[in-house]
Amino acid sequence: MCVLYGTGHEYYSWTPSTSSGANLAGSVLSFGGVVFGSVIGWAPIAADYNVMLPEDTSAWKVFGLTFFGLFIPLVFVETLGALYGSALVNNAAWNAIYNDPEQGLGSVLGASLSSLNGFGKFLVFLLALSVVSNNVPNTYSAALSIQTLGKPFQRIPRFIWTIFVAVVYTVAGVAGKSHFSEILNNFLSILSYWTTPFVVVLALEHFVFRRRNGYNVNDYGDRSKLPLGLAAAAAGIIGVVGAVLGMNQTWYIGPIGKLTGTYGGDLGFEMALLLTSLVYLALRPLELNSFGR
């Protein structure tokens, strides 16, 4: 990655944005939604990788390692992506490669490293392997997530689910290879539409409703002692509805998403956060009073 920063530096553009006012705000909101989607996707699975830490591990240490373990690499890579996006404006050859359905972003990186000859090809090879290695945690966590759906799913060995997930995303990747950047951009945007309600419900449950009493770990295997999830389900559904109202995608623009500038701005995750919070804070006390759990 550091080499990529160097090989593309002569083409980086610092040209001020041509948009202003509400149009600029809409663009920033939409871009922010993509960035948020790339980060928030770790929220449902982060605990899979720190659950084995000693019980007396400082909460601040867990938070710090998790936060900075995500923040530093994500900012580093996304800044590089922004710089290469600006380089496409100044390098016609790279721009042509990027817009070629048969090549795309990976070929742009290859062209950037071509001046290094054999070493550049070696780095491209390492980049390809890094994509595979980065998918390993996602694949493992996907298998765990499937098993949380219920005992019928737990009866199937985890490695079977892991293979199944790998086959699914491999087929999807091959089928969408000609439109990879467009699909990835849309996926990251809509990813936050459901992960935001998920995170909000967990955060409110932890910091508000379990602030004093905490958790009894022995209850996790006993459904009669677990929350019914009525408040969570209602809040999640309303949150997704809010996301739909605020979304701004190529295939659909919600009524609230149209309000910012000429082309609108994506307010999907913000609307999901707001409505999920309001509904859960209103309904969870009623659920506790009615069912005691």
Where do the protein language model's features map onto the residues?
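Alpha-helical transmembrane segments in multi-pass membrane proteins
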Residues: 65, 69, 73, 77, ...
